[in-house]
Structure formats: C-alpha cells, structure tokens
C-alpha cells in the first residue's frame, strides 16, 4: 500500500488562499495528502490538475481521492512539462500551484525501488519507472570526474573524490549491482572517524545519485519558472523543499522574479513594465511544527516558501 504522511499539509494549501471554484495544480501528487485536503475545499466547479511521474502514485491517488474524481485530472508526466500540460488541457491560467519536493515515503520504503541505503535492492532510484537512466548506469558507467561532480554538487559530500575512486576500483573488478554493495563501497571512501558523525555515511551520495538520475534540480527550476507564468495575478505558488540545494534554488528564483527590472532614474511614476512579477509571502521559510515532526521524522528538514503573483 502506498501510505504517505504529507509534511506541512495545512500550511502548504492554506497559504494558497483556496477559492472554492478555483483551478489548482499539484505538481507532485505523491500520496495525495495535500490533494485530498485541497479537494475538500473545492466545490463542483473547482478543479485540480494532479501531476506525477510515478504511475504507482497516480493509481494509489485514484483510490485516496475516489470521492472527488469528478474534480481531478490526473497527468502522468514530469512537472517540467507544466506549460505543455496546461496547454493540452486548454487551461491558460490557474489560481495556484504547489510542490512537495523530494522522494515520497513509499518510494523510500519499498526496497525494490532502490532509493534506500537501509535495504538491499537493485540500484534503481527512478521516480519514473519508464525512463531508461537508473542509478545502476550512473554508478557503473559514469566517469570518475562525473561522479565527483555530482557527489560534490548534489550531495555536498566532502569525500567525493575518495568515494568516486573506490567506486571506480570496484567496478573494474565487477559491476556494483545493489544498494548495500554501494553502501559498503561508500564507507570504504570515508575515513572511520568521519563515518561516525553526521548521520548515515551513504546519505549524501545516495541523494546525489537520486538527483542526477531524475534530473531533479533542473526539472524543478524549469517547472517553477513556468509556474510563475501560469498563475493568475493574486494567485500563489507554495514549495516544500527537503534539502539545502532545493531550498537555495527556490529562494534564488523567487528573489530574481521579485526584484524586477532596474528602474531608470528620474521617473515620476514607475511603469508596470518595471514592477516585479511576484512578491515573497514569507521572507524566511516556514518549518515543520512539533506535530509534523511527531508524525513524520522526515519533516525535520522541510522548508516551505510561498510567492504571490503580482502581474
């Protein structure tokens, strides 16, 4: 069963200022917790476009949302196709869009998906099971230089070079096939003293490989920039991130669109062309409550940022 506890469920949706007849987009359907909370606030004229690249999540969501199916359009696609998705549905602008980034609990907890460093499984990590690139190809076929780059950039792993060297040495003998094989190789690349600090020694490398396999940061950047153009004036975008790379990227994008073009000096009135595209609703990210943490330990690293469209 695809069971998933949504993080900051109320805040994410409530900050969208839901209109009961509005049109909204859930870019990361997952376990459908946020979707259900939102749909309970929509009347029969309201509509939710629910996007996920994981077919298992969509099939599960149809059961979770069975009382609201007449208000939902399910889309199996990557959220970086947001504009195309809305164009195909003949929707010009929507009232709000939200993202719950990162891997959902069911994807982590089902060993066969290969996301977890706690369970043995084939190296996979594909959110979209129909794509060809998996963790196996990244680990066994990407160059030493490419591995160092993703471990450092996406995992902020200070022992990136040592770990990549160990992977390179192992795969020359035989392919690294499973998650726990990879964990053992990662541990070889980290000094014993460092392994005892900062959580599981494989956490950062697994995160880096997952981001690379699913092209997560690039896809999010593409999608949220499209979202800014797809939301009506007064509408909002909510984003929950789970690690510093995502949060930094979200903050930078919102800041960039909040700044607006440089205004020429001496203008008595600022023309609309020089007004910013959006304003940040919260300057500092909202973090999980104690209730969230009690229900889901993964909420500890969650941050919520919200922006309102101005033009």
UniProtKB/Swiss-Prot annotation:
Record keywords, A-Z? Cytoplasm, Methyltransferase, rRNA processing, S-adenosyl-L-methionine, Transferase
Q: Which Pfam families match?
A: Methyltransf_5
- In this chain, S-adenosyl-L-methionine is annotated as bound at 32-34, 52, 79, 100, 107
Catalyses: cytidine(1402) in 16S rRNA + S-adenosyl-L-methionine = N(4)-methylcytidine(1402) in 16S rRNA + S-adenosyl-L-homocysteine + H(+)
Enzyme Commission identifier(s): 2.1.1.199
Q: What is its main location?
A: cytoplasm
Q: Does the keyword Heme apply?
A: no
Q: Cell division among the record's keywords?
A: no
Q: Where in the cell is it found?
A: Cytoplasm
Q: What class of enzyme is it?
A: transferase
Task: Kindly list the GO molecular function terms attached to this UniProt entry.
Answer: rRNA (cytosine-N4-)-methyltransferase activity
Which InterPro entries does the annotation name? RsmH, SAM-dep_MeTrfase_MraW_recog, SAM-dependent_MTases_sf
Might you report a single GO cellular component term?
cytoplasm
Family as reported in the entry's similarity comment: Belongs to the methyltransferase superfamily. RsmH family.
NCBIfam families in the record: 16S rRNA (cytosine(1402)-N(4))-methyltransferase RsmH
> What name goes with this protein?
Ribosomal RNA small subunit methyltransferase H
Species of the source: Staphylococcus epidermidis (strain ATCC 12228 / FDA PCI 1200)
